[in-house]
Amino acid sequence: QPQWEGLTFSQKMKNMVGDLNVCSKKGLSERFDSTIGAATVLMPFGGAYQLTPQNAMVAKLPVDGETSTCSGMAWGFNPFLMSADQYKGAQMAVIESVTKLVASGFRYEDAYLTFQEYFERLGTAPERWGKPLAALLGALDAQMGLGIASIGGKDSMSGSFEKLDVPPTLVSFATAIGKANKV
């Protein structure tokens, strides 16, 4: 996590542009052909210069003939918030994924969620058990507030290698079916 206290504006800017989290991901995405099958509704990057990443993946359903029915999927996760507060991090992951989906033209009432979780090996330390519990409670709180259920998830509870632990992670994926002309 970047440290900002005691730095000049110039130092803060240099730190920020040196952070891999703010660099362009366009080169990585170009390794995947989004035009295969001619079903893509939203290309990975939009805008006048094709540099703005989309909020969601949207593609028409693969059917015989033509269709306007499409599926959308968006993700939500903030690693800094999740590391600081697992309850709020997971809660906001759910809200962010649904918000991106709605901003892409889908109805939140039609959305479903699925989660991908990674946590350190729990062992016998109570504070380690509290992290995934707090995250799941935060995600549940957001689901209850939105009236949207998670239809499953994949947990990876052994996110440790020797003495290294993965940071607490709960990524929310929101998905829905809609019409391409509404996107």
Show the residue positions of the predicted features.
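Glycine/proline-enriched, intrinsically flexible loops and inter-domain linkers
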Residues: 1-183
